[in-house]
Amino acid sequence: MKYLIFIGIAAMALACAPDKPKNQEQYPDQPTKSVVEEIIADPTKGIGAVKKVTLKTPLEQERVGRGLAIFEMKCSACHRLTTERVVGPGWKDVTKRRQPEWVMNMITNVDVMLDKDPEAQKLFELCLVRMPNQNVSIGDARDILEFMRQNDGAK
């Protein structure tokens, strides 16, 4: 009787075991960490999915409004719109010092940027606090960038 119970439990455990690890099943097209590690940081564009950003003049006011809302919700606790450093650096003139691709990659790919990008590492040394990953989409990062451009005086 004990053997039958043991065999029954073992059979159920084997039947419920997955064939593949879940991450391969759900995300087959996602690059592995070794692929990400091979990416060399472009000092002007950073590391991430954003390779080229086309900026328009005049500013896209809808994007500016959405960027302001995202800033207030996810960024304002650590960043100011002036040069004042709170937890993170102030945002004044960021778009004059950095390429738009770098800004967007820093927002959307912060962990890799802080680990591998020399400019992001300098900011980390200055602030001594890692910027948390806010899970900002590329579209939302573009809206934040447009808001930052307005903050820096772009028209």
Regions found by a protein language model. Give the residues of each.
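Sec-dependent bacterial lipoprotein signal peptides
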Residues: 1-14
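Axial heme c-ligation environment in periplasmic c-type cytochrome domains
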Residues: 86-94, 111-140
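Gly/Gly-Pro-rich "capping" loops immediately C-terminal to redox-active cysteine motifs
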Residues: 64, 68, 79-109
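C-terminal capping alpha-helices of c-type cytochrome domains
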Residues: 101-106, 129-155
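Electrostatic cytochrome c docking/interface patches
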Residues: 23-70
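Bacterial signal peptide processing site
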Residues: 16-20
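Short pre-active-site segment immediately N-terminal to redox-active cysteine/selenocysteine motifs
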Residues: 63, 71-74, 82, 130, ...
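Protein kinase-like catalytic domain
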Residues: 79, 111, 148-152
